[in-house]
Amino acid sequence: MFCIQCEQTIRTPAGNGCSYSQGMCGKLAATSDLQDLLIYILQGVSAYAEKARAFGIIVPAIDTFVPKAFFATLTNVNFDDERIMAYTQQAYGYRAQLQAAYESACKAQGQAIETLIPAASLVLASVKEEMLALAAQALPNRGKEEVNEDIMGLRLLCLYGLKGAAAYMEHARVLDQTDSEVAAKFHEIMAFLGSDSVDADKLFATAMEIGQLNYRVMAMLDEGETQAFGHPEPTQVNTVAVKGKAILVSGHDMKDLELILQQTEGKGINVFTHGEMLPALAYPELKKYPHLVGNYGSAWQNQQKEFANFPGAVVMTSNCIIDPNVGDYADRIFTRSIVGWPGVTHIVGDDFSAVIDKALSLEGFAYDEIPHHITIGFARNALMAAAPAVVENVKNGSIKHFFLVGGCDGDKAERSYFTDIAKAAPKDSIIMTLGCGKYKFNKLAFGDINGIPRLLDIGQCNDAYSAIQLAIALSEVFECEINELPLSLVLSWFEQKAIVILLTLLSLGVKNIRTGPSAPAFLTPNLLKVLEDKFGLRSTTTVEQDLNAILNVA
């Protein structure tokens, strides 16, 4: 086992990364190794997909399968060895299909058949123990003895960034948003990463290409969500219990939430969102359901306590899932799509009757709690509608600075930094937030500036796209570059979606971003120095020190 993809990975003087019997996320060594083997086989699939495309051979099912299966290896997504092995076998079959098509096309046109990356020729075993034996050559740090740490760090930056982009590609696909050019670029990068390049310049350029790719994917996802559910609107959301039977929907999948709402109509079941599903309550086509009654709980890392206390059924539509046996709710949590946990019921297809039956069999909430509301829904359309008022308040001096404080949440005590910097931001500043990092402060009262709320909840992590659009609009109005705006980005990271959003921002030329609570363990001091010199990227320090630097206070 070797895994270094998330913020909670082991860090010691002897080296970084989880490499023992179990990772810090709870992932067993065997599961980690099987995931690495899956990725390796997927790289082989992409290698043949890229070559086959040159002959006009495109298989849409494969184009969507590869990022979906890659998503299954994200932090806190799928811990089920049997499911991971099934993905690997399916990938192996797809590789054979593309290989045959490619070689046939070469012969038909009199072209030489190329020898591709090693992952394109690995013979897969069918027995778990034999698959685990193969995994040694698929580890993400393979060949570490032959390359320096900087090259390895760049490889991992690209691998984990592309993994984040794959997750967003799958979210977009669920909403019928696919793009053949995006798929082609994805396969190209996936195959390149399978080549174990030692070219630092090429690897760095690839990291920027991944950021550009993800910018397009975020636009696709934004289009898919707004076409399906309308544009988010500023909305008051209840955050406490409502009497009655209940279902809790966590993850990121709005389509699954819609299906659950449709299938629970008239059944006397209240539906709550959790974690990154909170923004769903601002979409017109979702909030129209009266039994979508609010958001329960907070960010992913608190789920073992929150799900244990929730008196209903729970559906995990995507990341992040952690051990449901700790809170003794494994018999009433259900997984969907790429999510998996051994022994937990997995919903295949679009029939949620098992979830509904479980909810009806449970006690539900006994009484209504005193209502407490927060305001959400300041995504792209709402931000653009507010832009003229924002511009006027900037011009008259009422608004002097903008902060984007958000990203991933997590357990570390140091993450209180993000609460503290939001609270300490000057009263003449606007605070935008997104991702589950918002839970560090989204129930606090920040007031308003001439009717404009100081705290603007933009949405999920992928809604960084909305913040980018606002920044572009403001830069056009004020006839300046984005980096010249009074805008500061303070981002918390935990896993691979956050990595690709960072790459997206860097690829767009956004500078002077602060990230925390710690730098990714796979980035060496040399790489961090390059990112600081090129982009002004830096780690968070103290709230006082960072605010003074941001606001140019001596």
Swiss-Prot record:
Modified-residue entries (Cysteine persulfide), positions: 408
Record keywords, A-Z: 2Fe-2S, Cytoplasm, Iron, Iron-sulfur, Metal-binding, Oxidoreductase
Cofactor binding, per record: Binds 1 [2Fe-2S] cluster. Binds 1 hybrid [4Fe-2O-2S] cluster.
GO biological process: response to hydrogen peroxide
InterPro entries, alphabetized: HCP/CODH (IPR004137), Hydroxylam_reduct (IPR010048), Prismane-like_a/b-sand (IPR016099), Prismane-like_sf (IPR011254), Prismane_a-bundle (IPR016100)
Cofactor entry: [2Fe-2S] cluster; hybrid [4Fe-2O-2S] cluster
Keyword Membrane assigned: no
Molecular-function GO terms, alphabetical: 2 iron, 2 sulfur cluster binding; hydroxylamine reductase activity; metal ion binding; peroxidase activity
Keyword Iron: yes
EC number annotated for this UniProt entry: 1.7.99.1
Residues where [2Fe-2S] cluster binds: 3, 6, 18, 25
Catalytic activity as recorded in UniProt: A + NH4(+) + H2O = hydroxylamine + AH2 + H(+)
Residues reported in the UniProt entry to bind hybrid [4Fe-2O-2S] cluster: 252, 276, 320, 408, 436, 461, 495, 497
GO terms for cellular component: cytoplasm
Subcellular localization, as worded in the UniProt entry: Cytoplasm
HAMAP family given in the database record: Hydroxylam_reduct
Family designation: Belongs to the HCP family.
Function (record text): Catalyzes the reduction of hydroxylamine to form NH(3) and H(2)O.
Name of the protein this chain belongs to: Hydroxylamine reductase
